[in-house]
Amino acid sequence: MADISTTQVWQDLTDHYSNFQATTLRELFKEENRAEKYTFSAAGLHVDLSKNLLDDATLTKLLALTEESGLRERIDAMFAGEHLNNTEDRAVLHTALRLPAEADLSVDGQDVAADVHEVLGRMRDFATALRSGNWLGHTGHTIKKIVNIGIGGSDLGPAMATKALRAYATAGISAEFVSNVDPADLVSVLEDLDAESTLFVIASKTFTTQETLSNARAARAWLVEKLGEEAVAKHFVAVSTNAEKVAEFGIDTDNMFGFWDWVGGRYSVDSAVGLSLMAVIGPRDFMRFLGGFHAMDEHFRTTKFEENVPILMALLGVWYSDFYGAETHAVLPYSEDLSRFAAYLQQLTMESNGKSVHRDGSPVSTGTGEIYWGEPGTNGQHAFFQLIHQGTRLVPADFIGFARPKQDLPAGERTMHDLLMSNFFAQTKVLAFGKNAEEIAAEGVAPELVNHKVMPGNRPTTTILAEELTPSILGALIALYEHIVMVQGVIWDINSFDQWGVELGKQQANDLAPAVSGEEDVDSGDSSTDSLIKWYRANR
């Protein structure tokens, strides 16, 4: 397709922005039914877009981008298993991971739905054996602790989801997650473990990932020291497709759970990569987790674009980043259980859309890749909200909250959850409408302080509410952002499903390792790196 920025549709949007940019949310909310008009439902989520900087004309022009970019055709192609990942010639089928068993989908001659449910069945049997006590460690003890060793998509997804759904961990099994090659990560976990009741899940598609295999070998050595070599088979399982490497490590390939090339790591939490999560929350709730994904998939696939929540949120992201010049996007869950959600979204969004060339390799001329960040409320209010409220940078924000907590405590006449949500609603209100100098002066504030206390408002927010943080709702939330990524990638005409930017650093690390460890002379090819390595070697 043509570069979207060269099209008449983009020019029309540019002209519209010139006329619209001074419009305020105070003005927009003079429309009586605005909140109702811009509130939508999707897969159990209640999504209010009304506090965003848009009106009907803006939305019409943004929706024109979807037609210009061929979004409908690309959505259909993705769900059909066409090879949208053109640089690796692969299908993009994370949506198949949550298809019902009776679904009919074949790709490249393979019955995808049958393959997915065969692996799910094996995962279910294994998780059930762990939770029931039928799977025993080498010395006959039941498993109480799972240590998931992976990195990137093999860590961020299951780690986030396991914490988010900790209220569903009812079988006495808990999980720890180790990813960093910094030895402090693994050491801090191992020092509190009982080897006899610990199971390690090594998650690496190729079983060659440097960080993961370094940690896995160290964990293996620790276990062998405690229980002996023969214990490995009962205390290690693998999520991988490399049976030869898994067997070399000492893991029985009957305890290897695979996935497919059409699943990118950052889209894999609902594949075998979620084995640790399934073991902790149980197969029934894991299937509900998948059900939430599928419900959002169906909303995305079948709902008309003007009511399609992932599409509307994606278009708003393009509007803010390419027209308002917003550089970042805050995700603010008012839920401590979602404390790792923003970190998870960083990989999902930034590894996907952090690209500078089109699908055909030509340079892009628009911005791409929103920078995602965030922390749970109310912690963020006492840290960075100052900048969002009164700073010079526009930071669109998604607020995520729930009507019912899993646990609550009294707080005087109210409950702590009610206080949490009072803050939630207050923040979106103040960000939207603020308080101007005239209103502040009318309160008797000293004139020299008025400008310091002005709250400009006009900071856009999206509110996402659900009744409760359940497995299904978490699946729907994740799928929502997966589809936002896809839509933006189509509009920018980039490949959201490769990640070549991470490869060169890996290669260079392997090349430099002998010099860093002192096995070879330092000769990196540049004087700065040489000097730094020499300092490191002299001071370690």
Swiss-Prot record:
Its main location: cytoplasm. The active site is at 351 (proton donor), 382, 506. Keywords: Cytoplasm, Gluconeogenesis, Glycolysis, Isomerase. Its EC number is 5.3.1.9. Gene3D superfamilies: 1.10.1390.10, Glucose-6-phosphate isomerase like protein, domain 1. InterPro entries: G6P_Isomerase (IPR001672), G6P_Isomerase_C (IPR023096), Phosphoglucose_isomerase_CS (IPR018189), SIS_dom_sf (IPR046348), SIS_PGI_1 (IPR035476), SIS_PGI_2 (IPR035482). GO terms for cellular component: cytosol. The keyword Protein transport does not apply. Pathway: Carbohydrate biosynthesis; gluconeogenesis; Carbohydrate degradation; glycolysis; D-glyceraldehyde 3-phosphate and glycerone phosphate from D-glucose: step 2/4. Catalyzes the reversible isomerization of glucose-6-phosphate to fructose-6-phosphate. Belongs to the GPI family. It comes from the Bacteria. GO terms for biological process: gluconeogenesis; glucose 6-phosphate metabolic process; glycolytic process. The keyword Plastid does not apply. Pfam families: PGI. It is found in: Cytoplasm. It catalyses: alpha-D-glucose 6-phosphate = beta-D-fructose 6-phosphate. This is Glucose-6-phosphate isomerase. GO terms for molecular function: carbohydrate derivative binding; glucose-6-phosphate isomerase activity; monosaccharide binding.
